[in-house]
Regions:
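Short, cationic motifs built from Arg/Lys/His that form the positively charged side of catalytic pockets
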Residues: 178, 200, 208, 238, ...
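A glycine/serine/threonine-rich, flexible loop-to-helix segment
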Residues: 68, 159, 211-219
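A short, amphipathic alpha-helix embedded in the catalytic core of nucleotide-handling enzymes
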Residues: 41, 188, 217-222, 249-253
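Residues in well-ordered alpha-helical elements
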Residues: 84-85, 97, 109, 116, ...
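Hydrophobic alpha-helix immediately C-terminal to the catalytic Tyr-X-X-X-Lys motif of short-chain
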Residues: 180, 184, 188, 218, ...
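N-terminal Rossmann-like NAD(P)+-binding domain of SDR-like oxidoreductases, especially those catalyzing
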Residues: 2-4, 12-204, 329, 337-346, ...
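C-terminal substrate-binding subdomain of Rossmann-fold SDR/epimerase-dehydratase oxidoreductases
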Residues: 79, 222-369
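The catalytic Tyr-centered alpha-helix of NAD(P)H-dependent dehydrogenases
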Residues: 166, 170-177, 207, 211-215, ...
Length: 369
């Protein structure tokens, strides 16, 4: 079931509320992209009720939700999507009819050093959530929007990847777990008629992003006069999208997207990692030659990802935030905030090759019986 936005000729399609309010479960909503989407939906559609479930992992923060946490149409639940009992309770008690599944471990470097944690969170977590949706007794899920990544396509040196013509050939443990999770979603759609939509997005940047990712890490290090570590030669290219544009894309897909479809959420702004570092240095008045240092590359570093977003554009979405403005505002955000108010232990993320490992005392999530 899809909920279509109204649009006028020449305008950017924007979703409009249904007559009957939507009740959404947004997993991973205290993380980077999830928190921006939760904020957009809760403030744009006050008749919608947004339930955020987040286990507040190292890269999440309730402070990311400070604009909406006290709103009457927002409920926050601290919990792990791997907990079948918890998710089932939330689905039934809140009468959820739409699920937006953002919860995931997403840092490629970490996946090389701690790959099983990615399997537990990204694959097993998705399976538990799907099974809870299938077994919910007090509600019926009308849309399960699964958030995936362009990395499931694998390296692409030439053409852009399209949703239904490109094979999934993931090249790192993170991408493999996301590809596996997609297969589960599709299987539940086919086997149990669960209405689903899958999105595959490219690199997103902006405020509230945990500093293990390149742009916030570069901004913090350069502002301190420290070296920016570049993996390998730095000539791998990535496409970058500001989080405001990404959040609007999810809004449009939620309301205008067709079920059983996949939508790429991609930017045309393609840059090498080295050029990104130089742009950050330029904003901060630093000499790149003195600031950038090349270090050992990842175990495998895809040279290029590029995706075709024609289907998303057909829904009316357009990219609004250009690279120059978006990067400058992002660098300013990370260099003028008390970052420890968001993430107490973020300093370890600034290492050239960070490795996060889950706490030994993490409570095991109960599995469905």
């Amino acid at each position: 079931m899809c909920f279509r936005p109204a649009s006028s000729p020449g305008s950017i399609a924007r979703a409009t509320p249904r007559t009957v309010a939507m009740r959404l479960l947004l997993t991973g909503g205290a993380g980077f992209i999830g928190s921006h989407v939760a904020t957009l939906l809760a403030t744009t559609y006050p008749r919608y009720h947004v339930v955020v479930v987040d286990k507040l992992d190292y890269c999440s923060s309730k402070k990311n939700l400070e604009r909406i946490i006290s709103l009457p149409n927002v409920t926050f639940v601290k919990g792990d999507v791997r907990s079948f009992d918890l998710v089932t309770y939330v689905l039934n008690s809140e009468k959820i009819d739409v699920v937006m599944h953002f919860a995931a471990q997403s840092h490629v470097d970490n996946s090389f050093g701690n790959s099983y944690e990615f399997t537990r969170n990204n694959f097993e977590g998705t399976h538990a959530l799907l099974e809870a949706c299938r077994r919910a007794t007090e509600t019926k899920i009308k849309t399960f929007l699964h958030v995936s990544t362009d990395e499931v396509y694998g390296e692409n040196l030439n053409d852009s990847n399209t949703e239904h013509e490109s094979l999934l050939t993931p090249t790192n443990p993170y991408a493999a777990t996301k590809a596996g999770a997609e297969m589960l979603v599709m299987a539940y759609g086919r086997s149990y008629e669960l209405p689903f939509i899958i999105t595959r997005g490219n690199n997103v940047y902006g405020p509230n992003q945990y500093p293990e990712k390149a742009i916030p890490k570069f901004a913090i290090l350069a502002s301190r006069g420290e070296k920016i570590a570049i993996h390998g030669d730095g000539l791998a290219t990535r496409s970058y999208m500001h989080v405001d544009d990404a959040a609007r894309a999810f809004d449009v897909v939620l309301h205008a997207g067709e079920t059983s479809q996949i939508y790429n959420i991609g930017s045309r702004e393609e840059r090498t990692v080295l050029s990104v570092a130089r742009d950050v240095c330029g904003i901060l008045g630093k000499n790149p030659e003195d600031t950038v240092a090349h270090v050992e590359d990842r175990a495998f570093n895809d040279r290029r990802y590029f995706i075709d977003s024609t289907k998303l554009l057909a829904l009316g979405w357009r990219q609004r935030v250009d690279w120059t403005r978006g990067l400058r505002e992002t660098v300013e955000w990370f260099t003028t905030r008390d970052l420890k108010a968001y993430w107490k232990n973020f300093e370890s993320a600034l290492l050239p090759h960070p490795r996060f490992r889950a706490d030994e005392d993490e409570e095991d999530a109960r599995e469905p019986m």
